[in-house]
Amino acid sequence: MNRVNTVEIGPITEAHIESFHKTLDVVARERRYLAFLEAPPLESTRAFILNNIAHGYPQFVATVAGEVSAAEVSAGEVLGRDVVGWCDVTPKSRPIYAHCGVLGMGLLPRFRGQGLGTRLITRTLHAARAFGLSRVELTVREDNRSAIALYEKVGFVTEGLQRNGALVDGEYENIIEMAILL
């Protein structure tokens, strides 16, 4: 079932924190996409989001109203108008990199492959440009072909390769460095 039409995309709010944390944890525990293998503690996540909100950093969430199945709930996913995906750009803190941001994003498995990632990243990059950033960077595991295709589709280019840049479950993985000029 295509659920993209029932999904809303909007800026993250304090009300999204717990749902965002649950979704982040589901994606992290897949051990295939993020730099961490489980979500940070809820209070760390809360501090990150509240800081993003306070500074006006681009952070958008995809939410859905009550269409997540019972099987997804038992797998740790969420119900209600809750977060099913996110995309954020956090500006770098050093003065010479103040024009740069770092992109992070994720989607619950059931919501992948339906164009939602494109909607999220497009909205977030537009907000990053409006925020004053002129460069956005990301890293992605080399075997994450669908994410790489998405990033290339919206204009990211490969700038480098970190050989054996990640070690997960005893297996090394290459990390691709990508960026887009806004």
What do these predicted ranges mean?
Residues N2-R3, E173-L182:
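Terminal substrate-recognition subdomain of acyl/acetyltransferases
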Residues V7-F20:
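A short beta-loop-alpha structural element at the N-terminal edge
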Residues P11-E14, V26-A28, R32-R110, I121-R123, ...:
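Acetyl-CoA-dependent GNAT
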Residues Q114:
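Flexible nucleotide-binding loop
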Residues G117, I121, N144-A147, N164-G170:
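Short glycine/proline-centered loop/turn elements that form peptide/ligand docking sites
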Residues I121, A128-T139:
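Conserved GNAT acetyl-CoA-binding A-motif
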Residues R135-R141, E152, V157-E173:
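Conserved catalytic-core motifs of GNAT/GCN5-like acyltransferases
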